Amino acid sequence: MRPVYLDVTRLLKGIFFRKRATGVDRVSLAYVRHYGEDARAVLAARGHHFAVSHQASRRLFDVIKHYYEDDGRVERFLLANALLSSARSRIERGGVLIHTSHSGAEFDRYFRSLKLNGVDVVFMVHDLIPLTHASYCRAGTAQVHERRLRSALSMSSGIIANSRATLDDMAGYAASNGFRVPPAVVAKLAPGTEIGNDATAPIAGPYFVMVGTIEPRKNHLLILDVWRQMVERLGASAPKLVVIGREGWKCSNVIDLLKNNALWQGTVAWYPDCPDTALGGWLKHARALLFPS
């Protein structure tokens, strides 16, 4: 089997800044679980990168899994110690780098240097939203994401897409911009968290759950408007809505609504820092998981 390398830069940043796992992070974590026993870790900054030894990689992978699977309870000095004790090296010629996070690919010297040194890059594309729906993203995100796609299309040896729609979007972008799509596969995503075994629901009565960072494209505003109308008609007997997700970008109006307890009469609850153990319980007993975007 060819040597496998995993870029875990984004996951390590999440630990340093004590962040909960996003959807992209959960995908990267799944690859760490699958390949971690034999793979080596790669870290990158502004296109410069290095690999660490197998032993150091296992320590890093263990810290990563412990942090994201144990509700964020890990001391950062353990991560720092694993990094500082790591001998840095280049990725071996003939190796395969699996890049699952988008982050860092905007610096084209990263993938270019790997290609020149006989390393195959397999790049995972999660979406093209910054290009197809730029108004829902921060200023400058479209330009960064376009650089990532151009790097992947011109210098990677393979593409993983999380859906047929994503792959079709990428193929359309490639055709419009003079690129050839490398060999590609659709790898659909499994659930990112275990459903709890608790037989008791977290709250009494029927409830619905919405999970995701609070930002315009997730359409929380639409759901809250629907719930407001139900509360106006049904009062406190309206079904409950549980919103799980941290505060994101350009969402002050949604946050103001979520904090307006008088408006909701106890029917809407917001959990900005929900651990996975609790999330599993919420999902198990919910009537439905809502995705209005």
Q: Each predicted region: which residue ranges?
A:
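Carbohydrate transferase catalytic cores enriched for Leloir-type hexosyltransferases
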Residues: 1-293
